[in-house]
């Protein structure tokens, strides 16, 4: 297998960042990829919350738009048709300040909107509709 210099090939259990230390590892990365064909998972907001420029698979099939991320503002949307183009754009201009701005805005959005406090508030509001 050909290894690329800008990709970390270390498995999670082969370094000190395991279990609850994993977010500290994510914070060391400039970018990350989250892809799930059928439904978004915790990696979507976990990576964004760590401040990574997050390439997210958001499609009609996985219904990921409900998370509230905005393509080009809080993350980069990818799908099976555009991911190579999106990665190439980033890798060919990796020092462009727009990537850091998107990562920072994505982190702020995630910490503000996808947290336990907000989830409990939303759940209480939903429950009061049915009581």
What are these regions (language model features)?
Residues 1-8:
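Short helix-loop-beta junction
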Residues 10-16, 20-131:
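Catalytic binding pocket for nucleotide-activated donors in carbohydrate/polymer assembly enzymes
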